[in-house]
């Protein structure tokens, strides 16, 4: 799990660099995959009860015997900061489209820590939610897999199990549940005229209304 955490952290850091260079991360990964020994990892939020937790057991033990694990903790720091990073990028795109950030409405797609499951343990979507609401943004969450009562009890958030048709300035795909694939057209029609999808998973077809991580 520590190895997986570090591999994802590398891709997340490269994603931040590529964004500053004006490069699409998924395009770079596709090109890199033409090399026979390339190992594919994709950027995104890193949560769950394993990858985002287990490295701390190892780093705690290492420090208890007098060794500071720089690389492992650096990877954890990068992955833990992705919630803030994606919110910053979303807000930059809202501003670029002349939205009033504090009056914006955002829909988060998915709340579980991985696709097609109801498990919300250590989900980092909560980081995204909290950062967005700290800017005064009105945030809704849609996840057909997650138990709404569990989410309310453990995270204090309201989850819609069904897609409520409304208008949003941005729709952020956080978790790539299969059901979202069949709802792409409906979701795109729920955007305001200058609204956009912020696709963290590369699920939506490319268009001028889709921003990728």
Task: State where each predicted segment sits.
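Structural/interface elements that position substrates and couple domains in central-metabolism enzymes
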Residues: 1-213
């Amino acid at each position: 799990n520590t190895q997986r955490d570090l591999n994802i952290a590398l891709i997340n850091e490269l994603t931040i660099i590529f964004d500053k260079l004006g490069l699409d991360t998924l395009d770079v990964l596709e090109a890199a995959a033409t090399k026979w020994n390339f190992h594919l990892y994709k950027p995104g939020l890193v949560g769950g009860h394993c990858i985002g937790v287990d490295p701390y057991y190892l780093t705690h033990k290492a420090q208890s015997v007098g060794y500071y694990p720089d690389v492992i903790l650096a990877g954890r720091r990068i992955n833990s900061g992705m919630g803030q990073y994606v919110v910053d990028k979303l807000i930059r795109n809202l501003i670029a489209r002349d939205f009033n950030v504090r009056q914006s409405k955002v829909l988060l797609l998915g709340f579980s820590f991985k696709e097609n499951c109801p498990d919300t343990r250590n989900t980092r979507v909560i980081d995204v939610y909290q950062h967005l609401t700290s800017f005064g943004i009105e945030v809704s969450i849609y996840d057909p897999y997650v138990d709404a009562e569990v989410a309310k009890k453990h995270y204090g958030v309201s989850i819609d199990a069904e897609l409520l048709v409304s208008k949003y300035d941005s729709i952020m795909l956080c978790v790539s549940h299969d059901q979202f694939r069949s709802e792409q057209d409906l979701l795109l029609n729920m955007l305001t005229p200058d609204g956009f999808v912020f696709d963290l998973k590369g699920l939506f077809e490319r268009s001028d209304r889709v921003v990728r991580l």
